[in-house]
Amino acid sequence: MTDTHVPPPELPAAEEGEERPHRRIKSFVMRAGRMTEGQQRGLDQGRPLFGLSLTDTPVDFDQVFGRSAPRTLEIGFGMGHSLLEMAAASPEQDFIGVEVHYPGVGAMLNGVLTQGLTNVRVYDCDAIEVLNRCIADNSLDRLMLFFPDPWHKSRHHKRRIVQPEFAALVRSKLKVGGVFHMATDWGPYAEYMLEVMSVAPGYRNQAEDNQYVPRPAERPITKFERRGEKLGHGVWDLKFEKVD
């Protein structure tokens, strides 16, 4: 079955003398993809149980999960392998995943069903909308951004999700002491992330040399990362703690 989730239509042309509505530059591009049986099962059976929708007011996640627990949000979980592994390893913590591509959402939810996890919830929409509308200020213990699209070409750098405005938004959602954890396998993007975050107010770099941290034990190594290591590709982890 093909993915039926499509991007919103283009804005209509403005009438003469009419001001065009502002349109935020997005850091992702919707891609159609074929769904496996398992992914479709995840969407059909898992989304009613573990899927969340955009709201106009912050969500009470204590009510959603039925408890108060340390809470992590991951933006762009891909096929969900890392988030599933972390959630299974830490049942005492709650995990919120955000991903726009339906095959990945289906795979993640199928994994939640198969493993019998209860500490995971999933959004299948724009992460910026989720942060702005659904996540209360000062509520997250950790926000993870692993291997986001580096948008290699200079003219596309404005599409990179890590920007000063994004750093400020993440900071507003983290508790004091909460951590923004990023990872990338693209050296120039690692440098760009470091440059943005080093001047972002209210953060402290957890690296001893104010650069990159060694790969944290809690971040699972993906098959993609293992292949890259064999080819001599590097991976850079950055951890910035909210200090005020």
From Swiss-Prot:
Recorded GO MF terms? tRNA (guanine(46)-N7)-methyltransferase activity
Q: Where is the active site?
A: 149
Q: What class of enzyme is it?
A: transferase
* Record keywords, A-Z: Methyltransferase, S-adenosyl-L-methionine, Transferase, tRNA processing
Entry binding sites for substrate: 153, 185, 222-225
Gene3D superfamilies linked:
Vaccinia Virus protein VP39 (3.40.50.150)
Q: Where is this region: Disordered?
A: 1-23
Tell me one Pfam family matched here.
Answer: Methyltransf_4
Pathway entry: tRNA modification; N(7)-methylguanine-tRNA biosynthesis
InterPro entries documented for this protein:
SAM-dependent_MTases_sf, tRNA_(Gua-N-7)_MeTrfase_Trmb, tRNA_methyltr_TrmB_bact
Q: Which domain of life is it from?
A: Bacteria
Q: Where is the composition biased (Pro residues)?
A: 1-11
Which PANTHER family does the annotation name? Answer: 3-DEOXY-D-MANNO-OCTULOSONIC-ACID TRANSFERASE/TRNA GUANINE-N 7 - -METHYLTRANSFERASE, PENTACOTRIPEPTIDE-REPEAT REGION OF PRORP DOMAIN-CONTAINING PROTEIN
Q: Which family does it belong to?
A: Belongs to the class I-like SAM-binding methyltransferase superfamily. TrmB family.
Stored NCBIfam families: tRNA (guanosine(46)-N7)-methyltransferase TrmB (TIGR00091)
Per the entry, what this protein does is:
Catalyzes the formation of N(7)-methylguanine at position 46 (m7G46) in tRNA.
- Protein name from the UniProt record: tRNA (guanine-N(7)-)-methyltransferase
Protein's organism: Pseudomonas syringae pv. tomato (strain ATCC BAA-871 / DC3000)
**Lineage of the source organism?**
Bacteria, Pseudomonadati, Pseudomonadota, Gammaproteobacteria, Pseudomonadales
Name of the encoding gene: trmB
